[in-house]
Curated annotation (Swiss-Prot):
Region (Disordered) location: 56-81
InterPro entries on file: Put_SAM_MeTrfase, SAM-dependent_MTases_sf
Cytoplasmic side: 1-10
Protein name: Probable methyltransferase PMT22
PANTHER family registered for this protein in UniProt: METHYLTRANSFERASE PMT22-RELATED, SAM-DEPENDENT METHYLTRANSFERASE
Top-level class of the enzyme under EC nomenclature: transferase
Keyword Endoplasmic reticulum: yes
Species for this entry: Arabidopsis thaliana
GO cellular component, one term: endoplasmic reticulum membrane
Amino acid sequence: MIKNIFQSRKLSGLCVLSILLVSVTILLLTNDTIDLFPYLSLPYLPRSSLSVIPTSTPISSPTNDSSPPLESPVNQTRVDDHPDDQGLELDWLKDDKQWNVSLKIDWKRCESPDYIPCLDNTKAIKKLKSKRNMEHRERHCPERSPKCLVPLPQHYKVPLPWPQSRDMIWYDNVPHPKLVEYKKDQNWVRKSGPFFVFPGGGTQFKDGVIHYINFIQKTLPILDWGKKVRVVLDVGCGVASFGGTLLDKNVITMSFAPKDEHEAQIQFALERGIPATLAVIGTQKLPFPDNAYDVIHCARCRVHWHGYGGRPLLELNRVLRPGGFFVWSATPVYQHDEGHRNVWKTMESLTTSMCWKVVARTRFTKVGFVIYQKPDSDSCYESRKNKDPPLCIEEETKKNSSWYTPLLTCLPKLPVSPIGKWPSGWPERLTETPVSLFREQRSEESFREDSKLWSGVMSNIYLYSLAINWTRIHNVMDMNAGYGGFAAALINKPLWVMNVIPVEGEDTLSTIFDRGLIGIYHDWCESFNTYPRSYDLLHSSFLFTNLSQRCDLMEVVVEIDRILRPGGYLAVQDTVEMLKKLNPILLSLRWSTNLYRGKFLVGLKSSWRP
């Protein structure tokens, strides 16, 4: 009998234990505040019962493996500033059975791992009547943006982190050895084992770029790097060692060069983590506003400033800030044979007619440079005996007129004070009212409100609540930057931001430059002028809803996939309807996605290619 009682109690205990184990298991499986599989989560991912993480391969070293309404303001960059309403806006997700369902798309690979649709349109380039003025290096977009996915280079690796990347990059990520041979005597770049190494040399940097930069300031002390001078344009930048070195002096440089026979110099720059874009001074304006840059630099940049009726130099004059400086380091400055003397005389005549004055001219270790200064008022223009080039009429210089627009043959009138005055020193200019807004009280108020909102939302949401590992982020793009509030809120992070102003929206790019930030005009219905795998993070705030009224959302997503590196992020704030359209497309690309508070969608690009 005692034995039967013992067996009965034993069975009861086993039943209780079984029920307890089942209960714990159900609790674990239904409560996803407990992370059972942390290796499947995105880095620093806050879990909630309504967040969505599709099963996908975690990012490591990417490989080449294969496997099967009412219109709101076009350039609106509003942000969410109500942190306590998250439960109120997620009801739609509970009933949405399609949210985590991938679209079935038969993705194809593009032919080249370095494909740039608007610069590689060979059919359009072959039809050009002339290439004399670099027309073949300008944008020629296909009628329909391609929907293929750019393959990875063989043996592609996760890029080296900043600041290590400034001095060396993986050879396999940019496998273009021609530049090493072509520039072997100029110390631009050399191959060392599995790396490209950048010693800091250049065509004009005989003693290194640091010595060169310091000598420029010593020659003209008013060029106070990182204080008076904050925003620089480097023309024909090579591998961007000039701009990369200036980052240490709190100077942000927009380095640009065409896609040309030097083979991927801009790709080298971006892989190094240095701000750069593909552009050329040909027959059309650069995609920058008037009066933007504090300093423009050209070191043997191979631009014939006096050619094409002087239009290239007039374009520099347009984008140079009143009172700004042009540093020209080239052989005509210091060589004295007849050919170089003739170029110098022509340049002298042209700059005089533009009222530029020489403020310094010197020779530096067998290399010379001259520094010109642009006037800060129209008085010189008006006192010229020969009014050639003439002053522009207002229609030629209206805002947002730098997109597919012919180069000027005239001098834009200079803005009058206080708009024409030099901004405050850095870093004060970042937070002070931009000089371009002084005439517009309403815009000034909007700017203040925008700055306040972005400061809050960055600290409350973007930095700590979204599925973004900021330690891996260096090259950032804000796809519709507004006043640059997103970039300004990140100013203390070791990264840089390319602020893009959509051409169909409000033109606020001058404000961005006034703040000491860099940016560019673009139409997101077309491909961006950059190499594939250039950026770590793309950010969009209410851009896609407005874009969908003009262009194919699928094509925009394909372009984002092209620009982002494997392991890179897309952070989107938009309407519920747009997020519902966007998420299935991202899932079809084998991206991981996560939704925060029903408003913020974060996508993590995988290394998958079709």
